[in-house]
């Protein structure tokens, strides 16, 4: 497996059939097994450190180009910017932006299927009912935690990323600071919440420390409305 830069927003990953075998991926999976390929894609993104390679201003998308010895995966940073060059905070505007983004991906998938004679391709990204069983199990509210090495990283992050949370708490544990946020997936949509979380993590790091663990073993510095309190500092 190797990759090369195409331009500042695009790279090409070359995977041989032996590489695909190592990941237990078949060529047919690229055209009929969306969940497996999405998981494979994110494994490559993590393994190659591609999130750090790009400018973190959009979503990473990919396109598959088979060749005799394997496949080329063209990875592109797809801009997700609204008017003024920022991701919209309004849930309806964000949903509209994502609808256009998914439509574009579905068009690319349909073109690829047509070129390869695949007649049963069913565009499903972003459509109502996609992964219905998973959607039905999604909680209305979700807690997530972000770890920071120092207080300045916390203050910089929360002042640069503006959003309305349901509740937030602030802890210290083992020399690090932890911000625990409760957000409303039902009202904002899962993708909007994930986008906010990703922007917050530009100033900190994802952590597996649960709220329950921090409540029991951490030092609670701000028990309620932590974001509001910290923004006033």
From Swiss-Prot:
The record ties this protein, via InterPro entries, to: MecA_C_sf (IPR038471), Neg-reg_MecA (IPR008681)
Annotated GO molecular function terms are: protein-macromolecule adaptor activity
**Spans traversing the lipid bilayer:** none
Output the superkingdom of the source species.
Bacteria
Subunit (UniProt): Homodimer.
Family membership noted in the UniProt record: Belongs to the MecA family.
Domain-related comment:
The N-terminal domain probably binds unfolded/aggregated proteins; the C-terminal domain interacts with ClpC.
- Extract the HAMAP family matched here: MecA
What PANTHER family does the entry give?
ADAPTER PROTEIN MECA (PTHR39161), ADAPTER PROTEIN MECA 1 (PTHR39161:SF1)
Q: What does this protein do?
A: Enables the recognition and targeting of unfolded and aggregated proteins to the ClpC protease or to other proteins involved in proteolysis.
Protein name, please? Adapter protein MecA
Please name the source species.
Answer: Lactococcus lactis subsp. lactis (strain IL1403) (Streptococcus lactis)
């Amino acid at each position: 497996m190797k990759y090369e830069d195409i331009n500042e927003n695009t790279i090409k990953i070359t995977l041989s059939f032996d590489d695909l075998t190592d990941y237990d991926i078949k060529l047919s999976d690229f055209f009929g097994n969306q969940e497996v390929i999405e998981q494979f894609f994110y494994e490559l993104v993590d393994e190659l450190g591609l999130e750090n390679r790009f400018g973190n201003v959009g979503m990473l998308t990919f396109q598959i180009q088979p060749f005799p010895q394997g496949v080329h995966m063209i990875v592109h940073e797809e801009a997700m910017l609204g008017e003024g060059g920022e991701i919209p905070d309004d849930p309806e505007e964000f949903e509209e932006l994502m609808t256009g983004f998914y439509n574009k991906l579905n068009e690319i998938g349909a073109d690829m299927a047509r070129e390869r004679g695949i007649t049963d391709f069913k565009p499903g990204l972003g459509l109502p009912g996609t992964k219905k069983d998973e959607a039905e199990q999604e909680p209305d509210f979700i807690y997530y935690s972000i770890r920071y090495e120092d207080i300045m990283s916390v203050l910089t992050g929360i002042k640069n990323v503006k959003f309305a949370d349901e509740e937030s708490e602030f802890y210290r544990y083992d020399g690090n600071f932890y911000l625990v946020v409760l957000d409303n997936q039902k009202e904002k949509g899962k993708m909007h919440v994930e986008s906010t979380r990703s922007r917050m993590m530009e100033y900190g790091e994802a952590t597996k420390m649960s709220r329950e663990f921090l409540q029991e073993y951490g030092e609670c510095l701000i028990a309620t409305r932590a974001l509001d309190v910290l923004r006033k500092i």
